[in-house]
Design a protein with these regions (language model features):
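Flexible coil/turn residues that form the inter-helical turn or adjacent wing/linker of helix-turn-helix
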Residues: 5, 16, 44
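Residues within the helices of the helix-turn-helix
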Residues: 10, 21, 49
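The alpha-helix within a helix-turn-helix
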Residues: 13, 24, 52
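Short amphipathic helical patch at the helix-1/turn junction of helix-turn-helix
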Residues: 13-15, 39
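Short alpha-helical DNA-recognition segment
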Residues: 17-32
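Recognition helix of helix-turn-helix/homeodomain-like DNA-binding domains
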Residues: 28-43
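Short, basic-rich loop-to-helix N-cap that marks the start of a DNA-contacting helix
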Residues: 40-53
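Short C-terminal boundary/hinge segments that cap the last helix of small helical domains
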Residues: 56-71
Length: 71
């Protein structure tokens, strides 16, 4: 399995040399709240979208059936 959402966020943060505090501020939440979400991995779709925007990224969510059909 691939990286978790939190691992992907950390990787992008590292590449962009930004801190958890910077990302929290840019995404409109407290550092503590973001840290808790990163630890627990409990992100809503809205959280992910806001964090991606703050990181200058986009998010694509795809559903693919077992037979390979993308919906």
């Amino acid at each position: 399995m691939g990286l978790s959402v939190a691992e992907k966020i950390r990787l992008i943060m590292k590449r962009q040399k930004i801190t958890m505090g910077d990302l929290a501020e840019a995404s409109g939440q407290t550092r503590k709240n973001l840290s808790n979400k990163m630890t627990r991995g409990n992100f809503t779709e809205k959280d992910i979208t806001e964090l991606a925007a703050a990181l200058g990224c986009t998010v694509e969510i795809r559903f693919v059936t077992q037979d390979g059909e993308e919906i």
